[in-house]
Each structure stands twice: as C-alpha cells, then as structure tokens.
Amino acid sequence: MKYIVLLAFVAACSCSAKHGDPGEGSGSVTQVTDPADAIDQKLMIALSQAKNFHHKAKVYMSDGNTAAAIASVREILAIRFPPAPEADDVRNDARALLARLLVGQGQLDEAMNVVKEGLSSPRESFFVANLYTVKGEIHEARAQQLEAQDPTAKAKLVEEHHAAIEAFDQSNRIDKKLQDQLMENR
C-alpha cells in the first residue's frame, strides 16, 4: 500500500513538473488572460451566433437542403460583429462556404462576388488564403461549364485555367508567408 501511495505521489509530481525552457510555454496549466487578449462579450455572442448558423448549415447540407444551408450561411454574414480580427475570419470562412454552396448550385457569378467581398480584406490570414482557393475552384467550375457549353472556346478555357492557377498560387503565397511568420515567432 505504501508503494502505491508513493507511486501515485511520484506520478502526480512528474505531471506537474516543468520541463524545458520557461519560454516554451510549459509552465502552469492555468494562466491569467492578458486583458489585451481577452474577447469581449459582444464578440463572444456574435461568434456563438455564427457557430450556431454554421451548424444549422451543416445539418441542412447533410439533408440535401442546399437552399436552407445557403440561407443559414447568409445569416452569418448578416451578424453585427464588433470590430475584431476574429469577426473578419468568421465572415471570410462563411464566404468560402457560401461560395462553394453557390458553385454547387451553378451560381458561379454570385459565388465569385461573394469571394471578392472577402478578398477586399486588408489582413492576410488563413481564411483569406482559403478564399483564394475557392476563387480558383470557381475558375475551374467556369472552365468545366464553358467546355460543356462551347468546346470551341479554347482561349476562354485557357484563360479560366490560368486564373485558377493564379488564385491557387496566391493562396499558397499567403499560407507560406503566414507559416514563415509563425516559424519566426517560435
């Protein structure tokens, strides 16, 4: 019994001991949030609403009800967010999903307009990079649509393919830049 208690004590101590450099973030599990990093209640409420609309959209998508899914995603874009980077990220994530849903419905021009709204964002992020990926997918869909409707329109087909490649490359450039920044800050 004495050995079991001793073993439990050693295990508990080893789990709570600090390992590595103190700068590696391996300190206490519980840390007080810096007030500058805290998210205010208005933003939390808006993020909660967005999460719920996103879940509704996923349920509608699983039921095959694309129109209702599109409506739910549009609700995310209608939420009044306080100014914050998280708000931009949520909107851009919703724009990417909305654009993909619209592509699935053959509404390519509307999908491109939704993507362009998000690409006007001055802050580069994963979500902006994802919008460039979706932009490339829209160009691919346009090329497929064009090929089905007018196989003789080779110049326009090549133009759409190149636009898709440019969009994918821009997405990769943003992701690489963000990744390099993260590696520098390690």
Where are these regions (language model features)?
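Alpha-helical segment of the N-proximal tetratricopeptide repeat
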Residues: 43-79
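Flexible helix-coil transition and linker loops at the boundaries of alpha-helical arrays
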Residues: 38-44, 78-91, 119-129, 175-184
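Bacterial signal peptide processing site
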Residues: 14-19
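"A position-specific structural signal for the A-helix of alpha-solenoid helical repeats
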Residues: 48-51, 55, 90, 97, ...
